[in-house]
Curated annotation (Swiss-Prot):
It is an enzyme of class 6 (ligase). The keyword Metal-binding does not apply. The gene is aasdh. It holds the Pfam family AMP-binding. Its EC number is 6.2.1.-. This is Beta-alanine-activating enzyme. Covalently binds beta-alanine in an ATP-dependent manner to form a thioester bond with its phosphopantetheine group and transfers it to an, as yet, unknown acceptor. May be required for a post-translational protein modification or for post-transcriptional modification of an RNA. It comes from the Eukaryota. CDD domains: A_NRPS_acs4. ATP binds at T178, S179, G180, T181, T182, G183, L184, P185, K186, D408, R422, K543.
Amino acid sequence: MTAKLLYELVHEAARAHGDKRAVAFDSSIAARVSLTYDELIFMSDELTAQLRVSVQNHEGAIGLFCHPDVLLPVWIIGILQFPAAYLPLDPASPPQCSLRMINNCRLSFCLIQNELLHSAFSILISVEVCATFCSHRLTLIKIKSEQKENSQANDAPFSSAVTKNIQQGEPLAYILHTSGTTGLPKIVKVPHRCIVPNIIHLRSVFKMTPEDVVFLSSPLTFDPSVVEVFLALSSGACLLIVPSAVKKMPRRLAHVLFKRNTTTVLQATPTLVRRFGKVVLQEEVLSADSSLRILAFGGEPCPSLNLVKSWRQEGNRTHIYNLYGTTEVSCWASWYKVPDEHLCLEDITDAPVPLGEPMLDTVMEVRDETGHLVTEGEGQLFIGGQNRVCLLDDEETVVKGTMRATGDWVQVQNSNLYFLGRKDRLVKRFGQRVHLDALQQMIESFSGVEACAVNLSKDDRLLAFIVLTSGHAGAPLSSEIHHDKHLTQPSEISVSVSPKASPPSLRVTEGEIRHQLSKRLSSHSIPDMMVFIPALPLTSHGKIAIDELMKTCETQRQDKNKQAPQKDTASVRLKLQNLWKECLGLQDDVVVEENAHFMFSGGDSLQALRLFDDITVAMGTTSVGLLEVILDGSFSDLLSHIMTETHDDAVLPSKKRTADYSDSEASGKRQHKEMTTSSDTESPFVVPSLRRTMGFVVVRRAAEVFKWGFQKIPQGIFSDAPDKNYVTNNSVGNDTGLISNPSLELSKSSAVTNMADHLQAQEETLLASESPSSHGGVREDSTGVLPLALRVLWRSDTGRCVDASPMLLVAPDRTTVFIGSHSHRLQALDLSRGEVIWERILGDRLESSAAISSCGGLVAIGCYDRQMYFLDVSCGDTVWTFETGDVVKSSPTVDPKTGLVFAGSHDGHVYALNPLTKTCTWQHYCGGGAVFSSPCVHLSPRQLYCSSLGGHLHCLNPDSGKVLWKYSSSAPFFSSPHCSDSSVFIGSVNGHIIGISHSGNTLWDFSTDGPVFSSPCISSLTLLTNQPPSTTPSSSVTTSPNHIVTCGSHDGHVYCLNAQNGSLLWQFQTTGKVFSTPFVFSGALWGLRTLAAVCSTDGKVWVLDGETGIQKATLSLPGELFSSPVIWGSKLVVGCRNDYVYCLELTTQ
């Protein structure tokens, strides 16, 4: 091969492709700027000429202190043509590091990007400004000689080494230092003839064309950047450059690479690629239609084929390569292409990926500890070659063909080389060898593990830092690590995440990993401690910052018992500003603007993780979403997140709708709408004519069924036919009816309206068909009772946990499910098929359940961003928003008489909102504590009930907000109040379920063995006195209640109580805690009077006999359940913490 210089390769390409785009710079927030090859060469030649005028004495190297920029290749080529080696200095590095390089390399001149001149290392040394090159945005400085004279004596030989090699015809291309992975950082001087073979060989291996777009993923201080720059520019391709801050924002980076630019070649460390996350990898980076042609891993051990396969979407055609090399023999020494067919196999082995073949002009040898060659077995890898020789530190000359020890231990097997780990990463425990890197790769190969780092602590404890795959089925989501709502006993595995306790599901995951390891490894190789973290921190070169992990672990172990301070906005803002400035190294008098972005303010991934840790310890906020807000949000976003965050996970992009379990997938399309809250974007709405003329039904949790717009209440298909066996709330006016009771009897009647006929046709499994109209028609023995079962009809992916409960809008044309998610999404789904009718992305998380306005045209829902949203039912457009003083988790309630919408807020108030006039009619302070629960309106007597976490239950006049009476408890009320004709009922955190008369007198108090977060479900029922309802001691009650109260408790039971006196009718023990609210409904289709549906937090849905509490059906879902079930016909809808909304069907077996 004829030796060439790097810039000569670019000149050859420019002569053939002068008018093609050579380099593009995309900031992600402004228009892309670019240079053609002709412009690149012209500006490079111009800079070279200016340097030759300004630098009188011939220099071996010129420093380059800059950020990524569209002119970056111009600056590099301009220096190389001088001729001189370029020495990159990182503005993000501490000034002392730059000073060390300057002194050790005896640097005399440095080019500094103009905007960095004031912040450069000149504060530590004396410099002289030689020239300013305005068109190149550079300033040339000279480092005064006294600085070099004061440097250490052992640094002196370097300058002569540079000159000597140039005189010998060995011009240097660049000078940099190693990352320290192979030991103490070394200064490496790389001749052109050492790096040019890399460029030429990879250009051939990758089959480069002028149509390619190569991403500059590496910083200039990391030698793979040389390959990226000149691989593109020697092929006539385009080099894509982005700001350093964008590289640290995975989602934004993916958008820039594959949406704004069609990147075809990506060379990166596995850790950097992992930061995209599985969803982005599958849907953008390695999707079926991805523009990415080449993905080359290097700088770290190649991920397992199992892991790479899990990142790829079916149909992806990206070629995967494994590159190996060391900076001491810059840059790559070997390459291996993963056969495409290997990634398509059903069962991929856990075998490591080979290092592959030597690069052009490269020799690779494996030697044992005595220096003998190894042809089979383990040994240390040595690399070199006649031309692959660099100068290290103070070396002046090196013999051609010198072989450098890499410090990497490999295994030779059938002529293939397999990486085992760094020589210093082969440790002994209990007299046995442990390959730390091999252990790390093995853990990463496990299902549900996205990334891992393994290290040995000073006290010889083997630590594994693990990042779980978000949304992995069958294992806790990475977000679950950060829940603090239902934590149990402390565990050391959570130290890097939070000083709080660890969820049981996380301990299960640890147990699963340990079990898998125990089947493959001896006990000495199994980690002593597993630390689950939201993301691995990176060095500036994109490698795992293991030292930072160890420091973080130790710091949080020491601080894990610290108490979080009071979260008032002023103190949190001040504390956050201080932490922000400390992490960025800013002066105390620096003002942190509300729109300041951490990464754009100079932060990096290590500093982001440090800020995450500091906030975790100082403020007790533990969500994985916290790290994402730090990476891609403003200071204001971060403050808002901390103030509102309590336990849930972060926002991730919504995945595609999952196919039905039992039916073929329906291809419903989503309508994504960005958040709009200002009045300028509020849109008028028109109530659909069918709902306006024929009425509609709203079904909510706790078996609340609202019927609107009827001349008379249809009795054939709705709840509680108004006969002597049922208690029905009075209708309001002639065309609005409210029934707050569940479907206990669904009978056909001549009074069924046209609306009812439409609904009957819509609901195939409606229980109205041929059912008896009174209890007398239901068999009293068991012969008519059919065995029941639950099956999944469909599920819809919301992108994050679903704690909200569904709300159903039953209209003549279809039944729509409305439900929100912690992903900020509100989905409108077709009940029959699960298709997404529309979807809105609101300003923050949604834990509130929705309500429908009295006109039927608006859906109202509260949001973590403090807003109450009123959206057009038909399309999701914003009609009005009302801002409260804090997070809104309370579910709104609609007054059937006035149409006012009542909702609570964490600011402690209840608001009466009029969506038609877009005004707040009144607001009421509930005595202290956030209003988490939902208000309850009762028509006769006309009263509104609201409760707070301060333990206050207030009875108000719904028209004016005037207090009628108050009830106080020593424990908070998370439970929402619900009413019967004579009483209001509520559960308390002290474990009590209380019945209170409408005049405020306590009627009874039932005690459970755990906190009650569940809300009471009130239903009408007449029990036969000759039928024993339960075998429990308290079931000997012979009174026939008009209403029953069904409620869950954290003691794991569902309780059914007599609403008159609070006596126990029956109780049922679930297998988990009961947070959700039961739903009581008709069982006529199955030969039963009533059924009760309830969910336990362990993921189980239960269907019980409403009269006896006997289990009739159950189904386990793959996630925790805090959402309450809602039933219409035979369909049950509920949200799950595995990100999905489920529709189940209750069928006969």
